[in-house]
Amino acid sequence: MRSRLISWAWGLLTPVLLAFLWEFFSRRSIAHAYAFVPVADIWRSFWELAGNGDLALNLWATLRSALLGLSIGTLLGISVGASMGIIKTADVLIGPIYHMVRQVPLLGWIPLIGLWFGTGVFSKNLIVAMAVFYPMALHTYEGIRNVEKPYLEVGEIFRFGRWQRFVHVLLPNAWPYIFTGFSNALAFAWVATVGSELLFATGPGLGALMLIAQSASRMDVVIVCIVTIGIIGCLMNFGIGKIRKWFLGWHCAH
């Protein structure tokens, strides 16, 4: 218990030092105070946004977009990755296109997506789904293709059909890869959601709130949004780590 408290204390040392350094720069001049907003102003803005409901409204909108894009991208990614891993024809037909398309940076698709679908909610969700799709498809494919030979031989002994072989042999052994892909996809989904809100500033969202605050020279609000995005991202990463540890531990035990 004592060692854990010491570890927590050391972990808080860097943020505290950064806060003191930030406050030091904010007091150097008026120009510095604009770029490095005093901590007291940031704290005051946080309570202002929390009190009037703006922070909760925009945070929920961003979370909703991230979860929707994450769900769609995960389902499509697992489906396509599994198809390429199981069906040789699908690998031949889809594989080259997939590996070529995933080399294009996501930002490279923004002009076309905006031209084809406009700058509304659909475009934002599409960007998030694409960000999730790539790692999910790749890790599912790698997980299925790297199943060890003895497990495949067990399926042959029991004369499993293609579906039984997938459910009872390939998918269970691919779960570690899939969870690794999901961990990456979750981070990509969160970043892509905020990025799409900054690019397509339509509707509520933390990214849209940051743009409005920037145009109004409210850098304190911008900092509140940035800190909120970072905290939620860390909580997501912590949560998926716990779920991964529990699920894979339970799966291995069974």
Give, region by region, the residue ranges found by the protein language model:
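Periplasmic/extracellular loop-to-transmembrane helix junction in inner-membrane transport proteins
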Residues: R28-S71
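Glycine-rich helix-loop "coupling/hinge" segments at transmembrane-helix boundaries
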Residues: L115-W116, A192-T228, H254
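Generic hydrophobic transmembrane alpha-helix motif, especially the helices
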Residues: H99-P135, E142-G143
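Transmembrane-helix boundary motif in ABC transporter permease subunits
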Residues: L68-Y98
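C-terminal transmembrane helix and the adjacent membrane-cytosol boundary/short C-terminal tail
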Residues: K88, R145, P176, T180-S183, ...
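Short cytoplasmic-facing helical segments at TM-TM junctions of multi-pass membrane proteins
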Residues: H139, G143-I178
